[in-house]
Amino acid sequence: SKYGIDINYITPLLPVQILWINLVTDSLPALALAVDPAERDIMKRKPAKKQKGIFTKGMTWRIVYQGLMIGFITLAAFIIGIATPDEKLPDMIEIEGKYYNVQEVDNVEQKIADGAKLLDKQQVKVEIGQAMAFIVLALSELVHVFNIRNNKKSIFKTGIGGNNWLFGAIAIAAALVFVILLIPELRHVFSIPVLPKSNIIETVSLVLAPIVIVEIFKLFKINTAKDE
């Protein structure tokens, strides 16, 4: 490929990262959304037709485009990660199957003599790409929860309050992600290196991207179908 990496043999996410997304990131907010209070103007709306199912045109449209949105943002994070310039890459070493930043390891020369090996730049790029994809997917889904609470009104009008269970679930899920990022032993389990500053800025931007995109769709009234 352009970056010297054969992308046919790597994946944007590792199995342990996917498991975390399914069990923690998705589960907690989903349960809390079940007790989200009704919208204030709900009694002013026309009653739904009896034959109208759950999967309306509008809901189907949002599932499709918002799912693709999250998917593309995650893939973009991975691609940006593997495109990190060589001069910004951290030095990494593999010890007993786990990857460490060289700065975290004492007696590097002795570790290498004992069988550890320094990662080449291509391997480091893959590690950074997978880390960015995981962080972006985990946190952007939590951010996106606030988008889906109201299909028409801006998040800046509805706010993020009104459901303490939801706010707590998102806070816990986000805090657990940061625990993984801050504790070296957990970072090693999830194969997440310490990201360069430029990658951190790019990651934060992608995490917030769902709010920008959905707000634009709401502004131009294309987040909903005509019959909604």
Regions found by a protein language model. Give the residues of each.
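C-terminal transmembrane module of polytopic membrane proteins
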Residues: A34, P90-I112, L119, Q130-A131, ...
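Membrane-embedded transport module
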Residues: S1-K152
